[in-house]
């Protein structure tokens, strides 16, 4: 499938089959993370893979949704702030780097028939505690990973001319 077809196929999956994700497919989506670009190639990204079976109650502390804990795998994208490039104005790029790597993961998963869902509204303190994150490692994004048990609804997107400007605003 070409890239635009892949981008159109991706959707936020909120129901998962109990079927396990094969190790080979998990390795492929994690390789996509590894290959993602980062500012100045500093690679301040770390990903924690969590198999949810038997951990549902503690994972609910992070994000209390049935569909979150019903996915066979949940992945947390973390940034190591001290390793990230700091640009002009003091902007630390760790969150941007983690976001790019997570998008690589999500698109790779989609290409393999797996479903995902971005989760940004999680409890960061609970994530630090449940995942045992060391000082200086910040949880930035979660995604579920598994085989979809739902069907995508039509996506509403703004028209291109509403989001793109040429040369100046």
Language-model features: where?
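Acidic, metal-associated active-site segment
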Residues: 102-110
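Short secondary-structure boundary segments
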Residues: 79, 121, 147
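A glycine-rich helix N-cap at a beta->alpha junction
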Residues: 67-71, 75, 132-154
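Structured binding elements
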Residues: 113
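Glycine/small-residue-rich phosphate/adenosyl-binding loop
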Residues: 25-31, 35-101
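Active-site helix/loop module of the DD-peptidase/beta-lactamase fold
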Residues: 119-136
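C-terminal helix-cap and adjacent tail motif
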Residues: 3-13, 17-20, 25, 141-169
């Amino acid at each position: 499938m070409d890239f635009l077809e892949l981008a159109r196929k991706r959707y936020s999956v909120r129901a998962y089959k109990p079927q396990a994700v094969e190790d080979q497919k998990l390795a492929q989506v994690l390789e996509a993370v590894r290959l993602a670009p980062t500012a100045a190639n500093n690679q301040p990204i770390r990903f924690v893979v969590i198999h949810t079976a038997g951990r549902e109650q503690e994972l609910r502390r992070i994000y209390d949704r049935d569909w979150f804990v019903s996915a066979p795998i949940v992945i947390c994208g973390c940034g190591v702030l001290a390793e990230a490039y700091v640009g002009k104005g003091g902007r630390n790029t760790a969150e941007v780097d983690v976001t790019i790597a997570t998008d690589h993961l999500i698109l790779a998963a989609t290409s393999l028939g797996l479903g995902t869902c971005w989760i940004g509204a999680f409890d960061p303190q609970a994530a630090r505690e449940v995942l045992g994150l060391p000082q200086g490692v910040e949880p930035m994004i979660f995604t579920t990973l598994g085989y979809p048990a739902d069907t995508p609804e039509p996506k509403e997107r703004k028209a291109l001319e509403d989001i793109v400007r040429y040369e100046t605003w």
